[in-house]
UniProtKB/Swiss-Prot annotation:
Protein name: FAD-dependent monooxygenase ausM
Purpose of the protein: FAD-dependent monooxygenase; part of the gene cluster A that mediates the biosynthesis of the fungal meroterpenoid acetoxydehydroaustin. The first step of the pathway is the synthesis of 3,5-dimethylorsellinic acid by the polyketide synthase ausA. 3,5-dimethylorsellinic acid is then prenylated by the polyprenyl transferase ausN. Further epoxidation by the FAD-dependent monooxygenase ausM and cyclization by the probable terpene cyclase ausL lead to the formation of protoaustinoid A.
GO CC annotations on file: membrane
A Pfam family this chain is assigned to: FAD_binding_3
Keyword match Transmembrane helix: yes
Organism expressing this protein natively: Penicillium brasilianum
Family stated for the protein in its record: Belongs to the paxM FAD-dependent monooxygenase family.
InterPro entries assigned to the protein according to its UniProt record, in alphabetical order: FAD-bd, FAD/NAD-bd_sf, FAD_mOase_fung
Topological type in the membrane: Single-pass membrane protein
Pathway: Secondary metabolite biosynthesis; terpenoid biosynthesis
Major subcellular site: membrane
Amino acid sequence: MSQATVEEKSKLRVIIVGGSVAGLTLAHCLAKANIDHIVLEKRAEISPQEGAFIGIWPNGARIFDQLGLYEDFESLTPPVHRMNVRFPDGFTFSSYLPRTIQERFGYPIISIDRQKVLETLYERYPHKSNVLVNKKVMNVRFSGKGVSVVTEDGSAYDGDLVVGADGIHSRIRSEMWRLADENHPGLITSQDKQAFTVEYACVFGISEQLPSLPAGEHINSYSNGLCVITFHGEKGRIFWFLLVKLPEKTTYPNTPRFSASDAASLCNKFARFRVSEDICVSDLWMHKLFASMTALEEGILERWHYDRIVLLGDSVHKMTPNIGQGANTALEDASVLASLLNNLSKLSTEDGTSAYAMTKLLNEYQSTRYERAKNTHDKSRFGARLHTRDDMIKTLIGRYVFPYAGPRVLERSVKSLATAHSVEYLPFPKRLGPAWGEYSSPNKSTLGSTPIHMLTLLLPCLFYFMYSKLNLFVSL
């Protein structure tokens, strides 16, 4: 018998808008806490095939394991154990950092078809009648002591909190801004309304097995204004993305949209670009099962909530896929919000659902998550520009520092992952590795200063390079 059938359900009611990875994970968390909730999804199905994939790192894996879901995902694909990096001058190097991450944390890095993740989250969710499809949200209304969500079909859903887990094109974010503008003009700044910008586009693809790309390996192939990254999964299935710098920077929502023909044209343009010694972009495209092209928004909001509305995941912070932390960061959002709601649900009905209590909770949610999410966003932003050799400094760092900075990169990765947030009211899994205990609280500077630390590493290398060239010149 489930916990929900033996304990009185909390009077608190949460409306989750978006059947995304973040939204469904939050639903699982709330189900574990016995908090009443529903999920409203605008599409006709929860898990459509869109050609996208997600990487699950230890910080996300631990949350999934707390929810009893991780083994389902782990069984779908082999772990990544080796990373191979290629530069335009033909220089390559390999690193077993992914294997070391697994040894330190007890969880490997895995890449999975996003459709499979959504499918598993839905199939393992205990209250499927709470997940409603074909529910496109039209507006949000504050009503007495609560909030109401109205959908396109005229239905209205009442609750104490609305959570926008509806992605970068968030309707809930738009409604939050509208209501704030009506009731507290100036609260939402022009900076927040222009926070998301686009400088890159990306083709995401899934391809059939290619003999020279062995399962469990991962390739980064860098060039000027371009990078291709691949992950090789179960039975050799290839998850890949081609990321390219666009001619001009645009601001959301006035950003480009791309079609299937745009994806084909871009991959044709770079058909001869080498992913490895034997594989080019044309090979990935010829063997594709699915592919799609999208603009890559980047940005993070300064205000994550207003009144009884709160945002999480891509609706509040959006990053490129280069460091594989977009979904994992959203999972951390869900875990923190659920933990705070669990605490709130234990108060009396009147105290637990009051506007004051909700505002206090949402302030704590943002203050807990903001700096870590901001640091992750900044690292992802730097990673995209490092991988595409965006300027001379990043070109030099990528080519002459990164290949030789393995221990430093590992230690910074460990520190960042070890200080991740999790679901406070659920026990930690038994499989946790030793690295989790090395740092006691979420770190505030591990990621944000990445460029400065890289420059610190770069200068000695440059001096050595210049000294070597000078000696060569003198010897001539």
